[in-house]
Amino acid sequence: VETILERQQTEKFKSILDIGTGSGCIPISLGHYGKFENIMAVDISQKALGYATENAVKNNIKIDFYESDLFTNLPAEWKGNLDAIVSNPPYIPKKDIEELMTEVKDFEPMNALDGGEDGLDFYRAIVEQGREWLKDGGWLFFEIGYDQGEDLRKLLQEFGYTDIEVRQDLAG
């Protein structure tokens, strides 16, 4: 969130889409601290969207929520019109899930954890499909696993993205 808000100072983002919004904390924070005209968020889970909507209302933040598996149910008029896409998708490699702390693996929905064999399945889909939804010069922002930076950088380069930066978050 901090990186997006920092970048918004120079890029003047007006529209942003959060993919896999969960409880809605990312778009709510962006709505509270940023200067966005349009904030959209999607999740595959109706239950998560219910919590996200409730949280947005409690915080008086306008967000358009959609039940969607990535981009599948988004309004067509968004194509080519988004300034930025943000996502904290499932990024844990399938083989590592059993090693997670009990309070994580036993209470988080599996589809919120499992990022496929190498943890990059959702990134691949967003990177590939995101280009048609972003404006020219649009931005992708991701939360990633501590050891996925170089693999994601290569993936982004393969799809022609530039100005790629990997930063450590507050947790390191």
Model feature map: region roles:
Residues 30, 104, 126-130:
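Class I S-adenosylmethionine-dependent transferase superfamily signal
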Residues 1-99:
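Conserved SAM/SAH cofactor-binding pocket of Class I
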Residues 41, 75, 112-119, 145:
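Alpha-helix initiation/capping motif
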Residues 117-172:
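Conserved Class I SAM-dependent methyltransferase catalytic core
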Residues 20, 43, 81, 108, ...:
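Conserved functional loop/turn residues at catalytic and ligand-binding sites
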Residues 64-66, 111, 165:
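Structural signal for short hydrophobic segments within the conserved structured cores
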Residues 91-121:
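Mobile active-site "lid"/loop adjacent to the S-adenosyl-L-methionine
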Residues 2, 16-20, 112-115, 134, ...:
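Short glycine- and Lys/Arg-enriched binding-loop motifs that mark or flank ligand-binding interfaces
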